[in-house]
From Swiss-Prot:
Source species: Pyrobaculum neutrophilum (strain DSM 2338 / JCM 9278 / NBRC 100436 / V24Sta) (Thermoproteus neutrophilus)
HAMAP family assigned: TF2B_arch
Name the record gives this protein: Transcription initiation factor IIB
Record: residues binding Zn(2+): C37, C40, C56, C59
Keyword Phosphoprotein: no
Length: 333
């Protein structure tokens, strides 16, 4: 009687396990041949979870033992059911795919914000270097991971949505592939990529606000932003001042009526042609300031300037321009 399986070379067969829609197992060898029970020739098996054994459904012969079933515990009969029941898949975000973890902060301060002494500071610098070296090998990977860590820090500090960080990482990757980062600081280029990403996602943040949370200067970030615009051929939409209103109102806890009035003011200003060439954050702050005065909320211009990330002078100038062009009569506090 001939064996139903390929001749053995003395080594245990390596079998690939497939599961059909009825829950039965079929075994396939490395050469692609269907494995059959050596006793009865059957090609369907079941898995004994208690013993870790693959057993023939006809004669009960154990064909594989001490085996871990790495497949799912659920059954599915269609591809749609498999997709619904599967609990694994590709990384949900680029940050996860890059295996980002916590990092040692660059500010050299303890948990209470106190400056570290010189001995401890030198130790932290050394640990920070080794942490970076241990995680990646090539200079490309090290640079990208540093940028990803910087963007994650900015996201945590500024409360920026993850989609913006994802977009910023993609922009930075393109800049890295074109060698635009060479000779420039990672912090400045990452901040510029984030500024661009926020505008592309229609969730803009003022450049001055972004600069407050990074080590790079405003001039460096602005220069890197212009470089990205020029070299990557990215079309960045002109920032709509109304996109800044909800965030300003949220920070100052303003009512929905104030928000509605501020949006109406900006729409009228846009029709009048007085918004072109103006800082959108400053226009939004001035519009919200006017709207709050109209609704009896007499806060200072400084409050709105801080919330919008602009100066008091900007709010004052935009306020005067809007009030004059739209003939709005409100008292100035």
């Amino acid at each position: 009687m001939t064996s139903p399986n390929p001749p053995s070379s003395g080594k245990p067969l390596k079998l690939r396990i497939n599961r059909d829609s009825e829950g039965y197992l079929s075994l396939v060898t490395d050469t692609g041949e269907v494995y059959r029970c050596p006793i009865c020739g059957n090609d369907k098996f079941i898995y004994n979870y208690e013993r870790g054994e693959v057993v023939c459904i006809v004669c009960g012969a154990v064909v594989q033992e001490q085996l871990l079933d790495l497949g799912p515990e659920w059954r599915a009969f269609t591809s749609e059911e498999r997709g619904q029941r599967a609990r694994t898949g590709a990384p949900l975000t680029r940050l996860i795919s890059e295996a980002l973890t916590t990092v040692i902060d660059w500010r050299d301060k303890d948990v209470s914000g106190k400056e570290l002494d010189i001995k401890r500071k030198l130790e932290v610098i050394r640990l920070r270097k080794w942490q970076t070296r241990a995680r990646v090998q090539t200079s490309y990977e090290r640079n990208f991971i540093q940028a990803a860590q910087e963007l994650e820090r900015l996201r945590s500090s500024m409360g920026i949505p993850r989609p913006c960080i994802e977009q910023a990482l993609e922009i930075y990757r393109q800049a890295l592939e074109k060698e635009l980062v060479r000779g420039r600081s990672v912090e400045a280029m990452a901040a510029a990529a984030l500024y661009m990403a926020c505008r592309m996602m229609k969730m803009p943040r003022p450049l001055d606000e972004l600069v407050r949370y990074t080590k790079a200067s405003r001039r460096e970030v602005a220069r890197c932003y212009r470089l990205l615009l020029r070299e990557l051929n990215v079309k960045v939409p002109i920032s709509d001042p109304t996109l800044y209103i909800s965030r300003i109102a949220e920070q100052l806890k303003l009512s929905g009526e104030v928000v509605k009035t501020a949006i109406d003011i900006l729409q009228k200003a846009k029709k009048a042609g007085i918004t072109a060439g103006k800082d959108p954050a400053g226009l939004a702050a001035a519009a919200v300031y006017i709207a709050s005065l109209m609704h009896g909320d007499n806060r200072t211009q400084k409050d709105f300037a801080v919330a919008a990330g602009v100066t008091e002078v900007t709010v004052r100038n935009r306020y005067k321009e809007l009030a004059k062009a739209l003939n709005i009569k409100v008292p100035v506090k």
